[in-house]
Amino acid sequence: MPGADEFAYPIGDLEEAKRLAAALDELHYGAPVAVVGAGPTGIETAAELAEQGRAVTLVCGPVLGPYLSAPGRRSVAKRLRTLGVQIIDGPGAMVAAVEPDAVVLADGRQVRSFVTIWSAGFGVPDLAARSGLRTDTIGRLLTDETLTSIDDPRVVAAGDCAAPSGEPLRMSCQAALPLGAQAANTVLARIVGDQPAAIRQAFTGQCISLGRAAGTIQISRTDDTALPLSIGGRMAARIKEAICKATISGLRREARRPGSYVWLKAGKRPAAEAVPTP
């Protein structure tokens, strides 16, 4: 993207987020800020900054929250507008370039921005790509359905850095924790000479914070496709906070009592036989 490397602030990792925080600290609160990307990260970033009093524009591309159902999208849009976020979406809202003080859209419009935040897409560490093992286009290790590298049975991957059968799961805490447990089970099975089990991963939805006092919970099928059902407002914020606390307490419990972690399971994925186990 022309100008993105020079003039936009990514927020994909801690160091990038620190750079952004420093830039915002030097910016007057009334100065315009643009957030590019309308996935959960972009939505949450726009909401947090607007709640602090920032003048925020969320540049969505074609649609706000592509994953969301219509009710979920309405819930998010309503809260963002309450916070004062200007939402730009539609066919002409793709970003064409980033300039020092503006975001240029595909239809020629310019969105004034003294700090442009780039939230479009996640990255992964380059360890797998540097290893010489096969990866997908963004560097996730290609594995079979037991999370074992298709090139080396001694290597197991989990979480955001794994691409089982070339069809990775959504980058999320909801996937990473169960994949970590299943990767451990794969290692234990191989140590004793057993055949590891294929991953079984179920999703329940997606939690989006909209500032400190509200949120949206998008309910999904177990295959991670959205249902036309959502929870909004303060209740959604409380649910997400409870989930975050439960995640931390679950990790602590697993450390005290190994094997105590449980997760919601679905049937085998359609890709389960796509890549043979090494």
Language model region names:
Residues 6-30, 110-178:
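FAD-site-proximal beta/loop scaffold in flavoenzymes
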Residues 212-278:
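C-terminal auxiliary extensions adjacent to catalytic cores
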